[in-house]
């Protein structure tokens, strides 16, 4: 197998791996209705109470009771807060559009019958409100207007008989996708209160609407601690009880990750906590964290705040929000290589003002940086192509005597000073760059809705007119033509089929990735053509010895 076939085979295998991951995700077993506990009994950290596992008394059409509602509008968010539970029931990100309908604002949290996704909080144990308690809330629309930097929406829960008051306040900040949830507990009673608040997400187990079958991206809970770092916990693992993650810590966060977006509760460091994930039945799951805030003596009060980030996976923003939150933007096993690639891409975009042109410029720069390596590979292929007639002659001479054929070929390579594998390593070194760039382009929410040229209005969506995939297919065929043809007719057919298969697959790939591939193909064709001419003009090789 020559170098070109090797690189095509590896990239084709990588593409098949992506398709396999997508198929596995689509074929995952439907969630059962049996709940699975997510936290071990007897743990030193606070444990979810059995009350939290009880089914909610709620209308059948939604699964969650509805109460008075406050609609909050800032410059970047539109949120709905419900007095029933004090939940954040709906959240729209005003700067982003839905994949299926560009006229609709992107919805992250959704209070629907079939696809609920909520942010909830409450207290473990009796005597304090949970996400099923009713709060006092002044309904209406709250707008962040004028020069105000922040907006507060207060909710109150009272137990007059026991002298306990809980104030939950949602704090919104201009220009930010972070919502602070401040809780103030006042104990005017005669007994101390155990403060073990929990913060969780409740979500359906399906992938977001509009996700491509051909491009698998992770959707599900994720936990981060200093000890275990970033841990994904698939819904299927939660369902069958095999979920593994760090349960207790004094740091970290819990989140729900999906393509381009993440929601995460970010408790402050040093507070003792327990993480949990469980199945609620009927296709619903919850993942959260319980904090140990200690006891509140009679006549005392205590205030604690937990930020909720719910927004795009913007690398710069995530890095500042919390340690390890930037890992929600998953680049896979090539993260160390992907980070500098995205850094370079972002710097170029700032200069040219267009992500499409930034991809083209970065592709050229990568090609120049790898030129010495790729030139060695292309030179080896050019020499092999020059020997193709002689190799064919040897095959005709020795027929099925493969031992003598291989011996004659080895002597020819030695005479012509050609190492048939000499170009493999340089080309193999380039493959991680392509894979890392693939993950960068797939994960970059900065390109969501970003246009390039004419018909390309969103670099993260497939080419609507299939122009780039067709160009990619044509250039891939030209590349095959420029390289030595396999002596085996079956291999030759496969080499011609692979570009067609690539074209079909890349119809469903993001336009930004296909744009990179097209530019890379064109540059590779130019480089290969020039090297072929150089080798062809270097003299005619001696005839084959038989």
Swiss-Prot record:
Ranges annotated as spanning the membrane: 6-26, 351-371, 425-445, 465-482, 494-514
InterPro entries linked to this entry: Membr_insert_YidC (IPR019998), Membr_insert_YidC_N (IPR028053), YidC/ALB3/OXA1/COX18 (IPR001708), YidC/Oxa/ALB_C (IPR028055), YidC_ALB_C (IPR047196), YidC_periplasmic_sf (IPR038221)
Protein encoded by which gene: yidC
Domain of life: Bacteria
Principal location listed in the UniProt entry: membrane
Low complexity: compositionally biased ranges: 37-56
Entry's localization field: Cell inner membrane
Physiological role: Required for the insertion and/or proper folding and/or complex formation of integral membrane proteins into the membrane. Involved in integration of membrane proteins that insert both dependently and independently of the Sec translocase complex, as well as at least some lipoproteins. Aids folding of multispanning membrane proteins.
Residue segments, region Disordered: 31-56
Protein name: Membrane protein insertase YidC
Keywords from the named record: Cell inner membrane, Cell membrane, Chaperone, Membrane, Protein transport, Transmembrane, Transmembrane helix, Transport
Family to which this protein belongs: Belongs to the OXA1/ALB3/YidC family. Type 1 subfamily.
Assembly and binders: Interacts with the Sec translocase complex via SecD. Specifically interacts with transmembrane segments of nascent integral membrane proteins during membrane integration.
NCBIfam families: PRK01318.1-3, PRK01318.1-4, yidC_nterm, yidC_oxa1_cterm
Pfam families (alphabetical): 60KD_IMP, YidC_periplas
GO molecular function: membrane insertase activity
Organism: Thiobacillus denitrificans (strain ATCC 25259 / T1)
């Amino acid at each position: 197998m020559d170098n070109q076939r090797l690189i095509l085979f590896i990239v084709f295998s990588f593409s098949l791996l992506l398709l396999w991951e997508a198929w596995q995700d689509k074929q995952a077993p439907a969630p059962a209705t049996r709940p699975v506990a997510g936290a071990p009994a007897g743990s030193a950290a606070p444990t979810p109470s059995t009350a939290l596992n009880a089914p909610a008394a709620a209308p059948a059409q939604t699964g969650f009771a509805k109460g008075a509602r406050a609609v909050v509008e800032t410059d970047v968010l539109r949120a709905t807060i419900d007095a029933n539970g004090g939940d954040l029931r709906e959240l729209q990100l005003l700067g982003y559009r839905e994949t299926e309908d560009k006229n609709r604002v992107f919805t992250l949290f959704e209070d629907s019958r079939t696809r609920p996704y909520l942010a909830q909080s409450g207290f473990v144990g009796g005597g304090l409100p949970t996400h099923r308690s009713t709060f006092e809330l002044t309904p209406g629309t709250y707008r962040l207007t004028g020069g105000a930097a922040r907006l507060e929406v207060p909710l109150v829960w009272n137990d007059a008989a026991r002298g306990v008051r809980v104030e939950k306040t949602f704090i919104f900040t201009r220009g930010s996708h972070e919502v602070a949830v401040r809780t103030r507990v006042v104990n005017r009673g005669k007994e101390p209160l155990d403060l073990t608040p929990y913060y969780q997400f409740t979500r359906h187990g399906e992938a977001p609407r509009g996700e491509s079958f051909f491009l698998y991206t992770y959707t599900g809970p994720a936990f981060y601690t200093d000890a275990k770092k970033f841990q994904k916990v698939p819904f299927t693992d939660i369902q069958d009880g095999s979920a593994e993650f760090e349960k207790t810590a004094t740091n970290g966060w819990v989140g729900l990750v999906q393509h381009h977006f993440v929601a995460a509760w970010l408790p402050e460091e040093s507070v003792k906590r327990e993480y949990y994930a469980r199945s609620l039945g009927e296709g619903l799951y919850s993942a959260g964290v319980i904090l140990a805030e200690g006891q509140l003596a009679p006549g005392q009060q205590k205030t604690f705040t937990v930020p909720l980030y719910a927004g795009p996976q913007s690398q710069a923003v995530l890095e500042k929000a919390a340690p390890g939150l930037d890992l929600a933007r998953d680049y896979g096993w090539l993260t160390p290589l992907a980070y500098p690639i995205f850094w370079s891409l972002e710097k170029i975009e700032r200069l040219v003002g267009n992500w499409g042109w930034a991809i083209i410029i970065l592709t050229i720069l990568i090609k120049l940086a790898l030129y010495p390596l790729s030139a060695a590979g292309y030179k080896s292929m050019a020499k092999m192509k020059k020997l193709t007639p002689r190799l064919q002659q040897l095959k005709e001479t020795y027929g099925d005597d493969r031992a003598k054929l291989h011996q004659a070929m080895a002597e020819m390579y030695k005479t012509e000073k050609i190492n048939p594998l000499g170009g493999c390593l340089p080309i193999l070194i380039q493959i991680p760059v392509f894979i890392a760039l693939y993950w960068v382009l797939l994960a970059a929410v900065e390109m969501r809705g970003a246009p390039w040229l004419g018909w390309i209005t969103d670099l993260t969506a497939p080419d609507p007119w299939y122009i780039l995939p067709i160009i990619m297919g044509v250039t891939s065929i030209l590349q095959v033509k420029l390289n030595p043809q396999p002596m085996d007719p079956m291999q030759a057919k496969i080499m011609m089929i692979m570009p067609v298969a690539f074209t079909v697959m890349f119809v469903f790939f993001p336009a930004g990735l296909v744009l990179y591939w097209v530019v890379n193909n064109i540059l590779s064709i130019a480089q290969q053509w020039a090297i072929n001419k150089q080798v062809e003009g270097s003299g005619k090789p001696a005839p084959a010895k038989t």
